Amino acid sequence: LLHCHDPATGATRTHMFHVPVVALSLTDQPAHLLVALGSGLILFDPDNGVRQDLPAKLAGWPDQRLNDGRSDPRGTFWVGSMANNVATDGTPTPVRDGEGTLYRYRAGGEMTVMETGIGISNTLCWSPDQRHFYFGDTLKNEIRIYPYDNNNGDIGAGTPFFASFERGLPDGSAID
């Protein structure tokens, strides 16, 4: 489900999707959202409900699914995957470690693999000075830090930033 609320009118519209909605981002196209579904990326117009498939389909679907995503300071969309933990009938299945991938999606359809071997992709954010990228693997109970080049959107090798949380697991992040 995707709920769209208009604060000016108080109206809320709900849009149904047949796969999980895992993340979304504004685009440079008026009235269009970039929506990360479990199966891949689409452009979506919430005003009329029109969905446009993008060439960025998840190759491992339905055995893998997208899980979390966010736009970087340049407006490039990053999204991570994991082993699908929901069977086609809706029942839970075990999560398999190491089957997730971190992708960078650029307008025009370029989907680049940035890292592999991830358990559960979660918690993407960038430092305020735009020099570092943080990315979490919930299954490994770890957040990694990567050098980030804001000129081209590339990352360097990641190193552990924080690991082995005693309470809770990394899932969602923000820096202010």
Across the structure, where does each feature detected by a protein language model lie?
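Beta-rich, blade/repeat-based domains predominating
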Residues: 1, 18-34, 60-76, 83, ...
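Beta-propeller domains
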Residues: 1-17, 38-43
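A short loop-to-beta-strand structural motif that recurs across blades of beta-propeller domains
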Residues: 1-3, 40-42, 94, 100-103, ...
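Flexible "stalk/tail and boundary" regions
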Residues: 7, 29-31, 46-47, 103-110
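A short beta-strand motif characteristic of beta-propeller blades
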Residues: 10-16, 52-59, 109-116, 158-163
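Short loop/turn segments immediately following the C-termini of beta-strands
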Residues: 38, 82-84, 138, 148
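Short loop/turn segments immediately following beta-strands, especially the blade-tip
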Residues: 47, 146-154
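Short, conserved, GDST-rich strand-edge loop motifs in beta-rich repeat architectures
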Residues: 79-97
